Amino acid sequence: MSKELLTRWENIETLGNNQSVYFYAWGGDAQINAYIQWAAQQVKTKYNINLVHVKLSDTSEAVSRVLAEKSAHNNDQGSVDLVWINGANFATMSEHALLLKQWANKLPHFAYTDPANNPAVNFDFGIPTNGMEAPWGQASLTFYYDSLAINEQTNNKLPTTLNELLNWSTQNPGRFSYPKPPDFLGMSFLKYALVILHQQSSENIKAQLNQAATANNTAQVLTPLWNFLNKLHPTLWRGGTHFMQSGAQMRRLVDDTELSIAFTFSAPEVPAAVKRYDLPKSIRSYAMADGSLSNTHFVAIPYNASHPQSAQLVANFLLSPEAQAQKQKAHIWGDKSVLIQSRLTPEQQALFKTAKPHPSALPFNSIKRTLSEPHPSWVNAIMQGWQTRYGVSQ
């Protein structure tokens, strides 16, 4: 760290101690909530910071609050000090100048992410972060299945590509489905399909996925998706005439043996559900061979945060090897670390060594190919097109 950055950080440590930080973050998962409480205990000990988890049902609630404060000219006493964010919500906050700039790239622990060679920490759904977000974790679309129903003995081969999934669902009607948009998981499956369907497209068409959806490019980009869904839907649960509302409902249908294959964007959710008896012991996790839709999630500081220095101390702690290793443990959260192991000391690397994983957990290094998220604007384009074509019967 340069002398200038060191002096800057010393000032932040001085100003950031002995304050409260209001951390607006989704509160729908008990494991994640418990991890945030652990982090709160650590920053209390290190900096006498009182980290308050303001639980959200949707991150857009925090976005709306900061936007309202800006409209009311509250430019320095905001209620949100730190927010868990990525994708469309980051795009909205960036577009409306609601975020503090050029701080995340100056955190001491940011260097552990190898930013010069790691686009995942410099871009969020294709949009440059410009130091407005500190990376916190990574997630990938993970599939899981009932190994009693799908195995060599039953002559039922596990589908490992999108095309194989279509063929499998055709041969096993009613055993697969996905939550309907705008559910996050349902949208993730549709984005995975869209990216895969364009793997053989021209570079110009593929480039459109990283750019804003427009009236001119929407039909051309989305037509392959509608053609695919027209083939897939008749093979789905309830003949594709009805879709579940959420990932939790999809998981219950697997537990009830109505579905044989499902998916999640939180791989640790699978072994956790098996341990809670919400899924059978025969469940196994795997990654699609043609690629796994993946993204990085971040923490950001609103431009009008009341305690921006304290929020930076918290964000830097969340990036520490200690905090990232704790977060990656399957029984804690199981969220993949954003740190690059080669940038760590042997002692720091040792923190990440774990015991034998649960049989239903995603095997280590299963994900061989990651797929980047399309531009956030494609979410609305897909959602509107899906509703027009398939939403009437819902």
Regions found by a protein language model. Give the residues of each.
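Mature extracytoplasmic/periplasmic domains
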Residues: 292, 297-366
